[in-house]
Structures are given as structure tokens and as C-alpha cells.
């Protein structure tokens, strides 16, 4: 650990000063450029290895492979203009108006509820997996731990 720190200290100390012949000047810039040049070359090699036909497809100037769009309406047989459609006529009949709040011959009354329920009996949902419904409507686990 001490050796690594001392070597790093010496390298930083020597990189601050320019050498007499200028070899140390812009050392990091040269390393940066060489790494980027190597990375670009590797990228181009991988592209040519996995996609060998990309350059051929980019330079393809065949007239049969080009797509042309029609500019005029003269040659548009595929897209026909829609025919004129007449809308259907609707007839309405008026019925006799109903009299609001008319007295009824049969009076209706609600039958009183004879049983009191707490709501669980009317629950129609199921229980989650591993639970079963009890007679009173609750969900209890099937296996007690």
C-alpha cells in the first residue's frame, strides 16, 4: 500500500515538469487520443463482423428497390373516391303524454324485513387461496400454524 502511494506520488511529481526533449508534454492527451482511436477501430471491426451488408445497403441505388410516391391523381386506381350516399330518413310518432303523479289503483307497500343480518350472509365473494368460508361468512385459514 505504501509502495503504491509512493509510486503514484513520484509519477505525479514527474508529470508536472516538461522534459528537455518534450516527451512528457501532453502525455495524458496522447494516451486519451490513442485509447479513442483503438476503441473506434474495434467498433468498426465489430460492425463489419456482425453487419457485413450495411455498407452495401447504404450504397444501393437500384431503381427496382426505390420507393416512388404518386404525385398526381391520374394513376390512383387503388384509392377510389367514395360514392355519394344518401342518408336514411327517419320517421317519428308522438305518443300521448303521460300524466305525472297520477293516482294508482294498486297501492304498493314494502314488506318489513323479519330477519336481522349483519351483512356477512349476503357476501358473495370468495376467500383467498388457503382460506375457507365459515358458516357465519368469515374466511379462516384451512391449516392452522
UniProtKB/Swiss-Prot annotation:
GO CC, alphabetical: extracellular space
Source organism: Mythimna separata
Effect of mutating residue 136 to E/L/N: Abolishes mitogenic activity and reduces plasmatocyte spreading activity
One Gene Ontology term from the biological process aspect of the record: positive regulation of cell division
Keywords: Amidation, Cytokine, Disulfide bond, Mitogen, Signal
Induction (UniProt): By parasitization and low temperatures.
List of residues that carry Glutamine amide: 145
Biased composition (Polar residues): 55-67, 104-116
Tissue specificity comment: Expressed in the hemolymph, perineural cells and neuroglia of larval brain.
SS bond partners: 127-139
Keyword hit for Disulfide bond: yes
UniProt similarity note: Belongs to the GBP/PSP1/paralytic peptide family.
Processing after translation: Growth-blocking peptide appears to exist in two different forms, a long form which has been isolated from parasitized larvae and a short form which is found in non-parasitized larvae. The stop codon of the short form may be read as a Tyr to synthesize the long form.
Stored InterPro entries: GBP_PSP (IPR003463)
Result after altering residue 126 to F: Significantly reduces plasmatocyte spreading activity
Signal peptide: 1-22
Biased composition (Low complexity): 85-103
A GO molecular-function annotation: cytokine activity
Keyword hit for Signal: yes
Proregion span(s): 23-120
Role noted for this protein: Biogenic peptide that prevents the onset of metamorphosis from larva to pupa. Has repressive activity against juvenile hormone esterase. Induces cell proliferation at low concentrations and inhibits it at high concentrations. Mediates the spreading of plasmatocytes to foreign surfaces. May have a role in the regulation of dopamine concentrations.
Annotated segments matching region Disordered: 46-145
Protein name: Growth-blocking peptide, long form
Amino acid at each position: 500500500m505504501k509502495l503504491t502511494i509512493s509510486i503514484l506520488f513520484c509519477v505525479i511529481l514527474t508529470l508536472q515538469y516538461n522534459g528537455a526533449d518534450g516527451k512528457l508534454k501532453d502525455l495524458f492527451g496522447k494516451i486519451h487520443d490513442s485509447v479513442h482511436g483503438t476503441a473506434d477501430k474495434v467498433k468498426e471491426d465489430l460492425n463489419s463482423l456482425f453487419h457485413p451488408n450495411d455498407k452495401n445497403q447504404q450504397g444501393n441505388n437500384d431503381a427496382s428497390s426505390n420507393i416512388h410516391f404518386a404525385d398526381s391523381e391520374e394513376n390512383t386506381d387503388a384509392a377510389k373516391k367514395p360514392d355519394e350516399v344518401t342518408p336514411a330518413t327517419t320517421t317519428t310518432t308522438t305518443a300521448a303524454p303521460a300524466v305525472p303523479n297520477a293516482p294508482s289503483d294498486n297501492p304498493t307497500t314494502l314488506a318489513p324485513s323479519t330477519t336481522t343480518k349483519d351483512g356477512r350472509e349476503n357476501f358473495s365473494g370468495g376467500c383467498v387461496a388457503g382460506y375457507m368460508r365459515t358458516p357465519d361468512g368469515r374466511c379462516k385459514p384451512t391449516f392452522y400454524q
